Protein backbone atom coordinates (compact mmCIF):
# COMPACT_ATOMS: atom_id res chain seq x y z
CA UNK A 1 0.00 0.00 0.00
CA UNK A 2 2.90 2.35 0.58
CA UNK A 3 5.98 2.61 -1.52
CA UNK A 4 9.01 4.69 -0.54
CA UNK A 5 11.00 5.84 -3.54
CA UNK A 6 14.07 8.07 -3.20
CA UNK A 7 12.79 10.06 -0.23
CA UNK A 8 9.21 10.29 -1.42
CA UNK A 9 6.13 8.36 -0.36
CA UNK A 10 3.50 7.22 -2.83
CA UNK A 11 0.22 6.13 -1.30
CA UNK A 12 -1.77 3.60 -3.28
CA UNK A 13 -5.03 1.95 -2.44
CA UNK A 14 -7.24 -0.45 -4.29
CA UNK A 15 -10.98 -0.33 -3.87
CA UNK A 16 -12.38 -1.42 -0.56
CA UNK A 17 -13.25 -0.29 2.90
CA UNK A 18 -9.78 0.52 4.25
CA UNK A 19 -8.40 4.01 4.64
CA UNK A 20 -5.00 5.62 4.55
CA UNK A 21 -4.38 8.61 6.81
CA UNK A 22 -1.39 10.91 7.14
CA UNK A 23 -0.72 12.85 10.31
CA UNK A 24 1.93 15.54 10.12
CA UNK A 25 4.45 16.24 12.88
CA UNK A 26 2.30 19.30 13.69
CA UNK A 27 -0.71 17.04 14.35
CA UNK A 28 -2.74 17.68 11.18
CA UNK A 29 -4.73 14.60 10.09
CA UNK A 30 -5.54 14.06 6.42
CA UNK A 31 -7.21 11.17 4.64
CA UNK A 32 -5.14 10.17 1.60
CA UNK A 33 -7.47 7.48 0.28
CA UNK A 34 -10.92 7.66 -1.24
CA UNK A 35 -13.76 5.60 0.16
CA UNK A 36 -14.86 2.95 -2.36
CA UNK A 37 -17.82 1.47 -0.54
CA UNK A 38 -21.59 1.61 -1.01
CA UNK A 39 -22.71 5.20 -0.74
CA UNK A 40 -19.19 6.45 -1.42
CA UNK A 41 -18.80 5.38 -5.02
CA UNK A 42 -15.92 6.94 -6.86
CA UNK A 43 -18.02 7.79 -9.93
CA UNK A 44 -21.26 8.66 -8.18
CA UNK A 45 -22.41 5.05 -8.19
CA UNK A 46 -21.63 2.28 -5.71
CA UNK A 47 -18.52 0.38 -6.88
CA UNK A 48 -20.28 -2.89 -7.68
CA UNK A 49 -23.38 -1.55 -9.42
CA UNK A 50 -21.40 0.79 -11.68
CA UNK A 51 -20.27 -2.30 -13.62
CA UNK A 52 -23.69 -3.88 -14.25
CA UNK A 53 -23.93 -4.76 -17.95
CA UNK A 54 -20.22 -4.22 -18.65
CA UNK A 55 -18.12 -7.15 -19.95
CA UNK A 56 -15.81 -8.52 -17.24
CA UNK A 57 -12.65 -7.76 -19.21
CA UNK A 58 -13.64 -4.08 -19.36
CA UNK A 59 -14.08 -3.77 -15.60
CA UNK A 60 -11.49 -2.21 -13.37
CA UNK A 61 -10.87 0.76 -11.16
CA UNK A 62 -7.57 2.54 -10.98
CA UNK A 63 -6.01 2.73 -7.53
CA UNK A 64 -5.90 6.04 -5.73
CA UNK A 65 -2.37 7.41 -6.04
CA UNK A 66 -1.35 10.35 -3.87
CA UNK A 67 2.30 11.50 -4.16
CA UNK A 68 3.59 12.62 -0.77
CA UNK A 69 6.82 14.30 0.25
CA UNK A 70 8.50 12.32 3.01
CA UNK A 71 8.87 14.36 6.21
CA UNK A 72 10.52 13.14 9.39
CA UNK A 73 7.96 12.66 12.16
CA UNK A 74 5.03 12.03 9.82
CA UNK A 75 2.87 9.03 10.66
CA UNK A 76 0.92 7.00 8.10
CA UNK A 77 -2.02 4.89 9.23
CA UNK A 78 -3.60 2.18 7.10
CA UNK A 79 -6.68 0.76 8.79
CA UNK A 80 -9.81 -1.22 8.06
CA UNK A 81 -13.33 -0.05 8.71
CA UNK A 82 -13.14 -1.91 12.01
CA UNK A 83 -11.33 1.24 13.18
CA UNK A 84 -13.06 3.95 11.14
CA UNK A 85 -16.58 2.69 11.90
CA UNK A 86 -15.86 2.84 15.64
CA UNK A 87 -13.63 5.92 15.96
CA UNK A 88 -14.15 9.41 14.55
CA UNK A 89 -11.36 11.19 12.68
CA UNK A 90 -10.94 13.37 15.78
CA UNK A 91 -10.47 10.33 18.02
CA UNK A 92 -8.00 8.83 15.56
CA UNK A 93 -6.04 12.11 15.40
CA UNK A 94 -6.01 12.36 19.20
CA UNK A 95 -4.47 8.90 19.52
CA UNK A 96 -1.98 9.38 16.66
CA UNK A 97 -0.62 12.64 18.14
CA UNK A 98 0.17 11.21 21.56
CA UNK A 99 3.81 11.00 22.57
CA UNK A 100 3.80 7.19 22.63
CA UNK A 101 5.53 4.57 20.52
CA UNK A 102 4.12 3.20 17.28
CA UNK A 103 3.28 -0.15 18.91
CA UNK A 104 1.53 1.56 21.85
CA UNK A 105 -0.43 3.72 19.40
CA UNK A 106 -1.61 0.66 17.47
CA UNK A 107 -2.62 -1.09 20.69
CA UNK A 108 -4.59 1.97 21.80
CA UNK A 109 -6.41 2.28 18.46
CA UNK A 110 -7.45 -1.38 18.57
CA UNK A 111 -8.41 -1.19 22.26
CA UNK A 112 -10.61 1.89 21.72
CA UNK A 113 -12.33 0.33 18.70
CA UNK A 114 -13.05 -2.84 20.67
CA UNK A 115 -14.38 -0.87 23.65
CA UNK A 116 -16.77 0.99 21.32
CA UNK A 117 -18.22 -2.23 19.95
CA UNK A 118 -15.71 -3.58 17.42
CA UNK A 119 -18.34 -5.09 15.11
CA UNK A 120 -15.99 -5.74 12.18
CA UNK A 121 -12.46 -7.03 11.70
CA UNK A 122 -9.85 -4.58 12.95
CA UNK A 123 -6.65 -4.19 10.96
CA UNK A 124 -4.06 -1.49 11.64
CA UNK A 125 -0.70 -0.71 10.05
CA UNK A 126 1.12 2.34 11.37
CA UNK A 127 4.50 3.66 10.33
CA UNK A 128 6.40 6.72 11.43
CA UNK A 129 9.16 8.29 9.39
CA UNK A 130 12.29 8.64 11.48
CA UNK A 131 15.71 10.03 10.71
CA UNK A 132 18.29 7.41 9.92
CA UNK A 133 22.00 7.65 9.37
CA UNK A 134 22.61 7.48 5.65
CA UNK A 135 24.83 4.85 4.15
CA UNK A 136 27.57 5.83 1.74
CA UNK A 137 25.26 4.80 -1.11
CA UNK A 138 22.49 7.03 0.27
CA UNK A 139 24.83 10.00 0.54
CA UNK A 140 26.02 9.49 -3.04
CA UNK A 141 22.45 9.14 -4.26
CA UNK A 142 21.45 12.43 -2.61
CA UNK A 143 24.52 14.12 -4.09
CA UNK A 144 23.45 13.23 -7.63
CA UNK A 145 19.73 13.93 -7.20
Walk through the language-model features, giving the residues of each:
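Conserved subregion of the PPM/PP2C metallophosphatase catalytic domain
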Residues: 1-79, 83-145
